[in-house]
A protein has these predicted regions:
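A conserved helix-loop-beta module that forms one wall/lid of the active-site cleft
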Residues: 1-31
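Short acidic/polar capping segments at secondary-structure boundaries
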Residues: 4, 19-23, 34-35, 54-56, ...
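Domain-scale recognition of functional cores that engage charged ligands
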Residues: 21-27, 58, 85, 105
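Conserved ATP-binding module of the ATP-grasp superfamily
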Residues: 27-60, 75, 88, 130-140
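Coil-to-beta-strand transition motifs
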Residues: 56-58, 67-72, 154-159
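Short beta-strand scaffold segments in enzyme catalytic cores
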Residues: 60-63, 150
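ATP-dependent carboxylate/phosphate-activation module, predominantly the ATP-grasp catalytic core
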Residues: 63-133, 165-174
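Conserved metal-phosphate-binding beta-hairpin within the catalytic cores
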Residues: 131-171
């Protein structure tokens, strides 16, 4: 997704995230510039990323890359269950109007997810591109061992990486 360095460039909904793992805390959604300016005043982090908010299904793909065999494996996939954003999604828009509830993204659990077969080649290719790019950026072996691509899949089945974790994230049963 597009990232914004200047709030004046914000033209559509964004999510603002602190750096580092925070268990789903340290996020807020803003509809536009005015909403951002209002919410940033209460935000507790001085360092943050402003990222285009992509509407779709979240997916966490856990990979393992071995520089010895030069092979990448998909170990598992899952989806986070977050309060209160997941329960808000079950309330029709007209039922949300007038509620003074800001979405929160505190992780309460993960559910295994089986990705549609037609999307598997792209999921593998994305992992391979991350490894190849890391080799160019870091030299030598680049990224190796476990890592996770945190993605959003849109209704037209486009896959966007929203974060890269250099580890297996909490949702796997490995």
């Amino acid at each position: 997704p597009r990232q914004f360095d200047d709030i004046e460039d914000i033209t559509y909904p964004v999510i603002v995230k602190t750096y580092g793992a925070a268990g789903g805390k340290g996020y807020f959604y803003a509809r536009d510039k005015a909403d951002f300016k209002k919410k940033i005043k209460a935000f507790k982090s001085e360092q943050y990323v402003i990222q285009e908010y992509i509407i779709g299904v979240t997916l966490y793909v856990h990979y393992f890359y071995s520089p010895i065999t030069n092979e990448i494996e998909v170990l598992s996939m899952d989806r986070r269950y977050e309060t209160n954003v997941d329960s808000l999604g079950r309330i029709p828009l007209h039922g949300q109007q007038g509620l003074d509830i800001n979405p929160s993204y505190v992780v309460v659990g993960n559910q295994p997810l089986i990705l549609r077969e037609s999307l598997l080649p792209e999921a593998f290719a994305m992992g391979e591109r991350v490894v190849e790019t890391s080799k160019k950026l870091m030299g030598g072996k680049g990224l190796f061992g476990p890592f996770c691509l945190e993605m959003v899949i849109t209704p037209d089945q486009r896959m966007f990486v929203i974060e890269i974790s250099g580890r297996i994230v909490a949702g796997t049963s490995l």
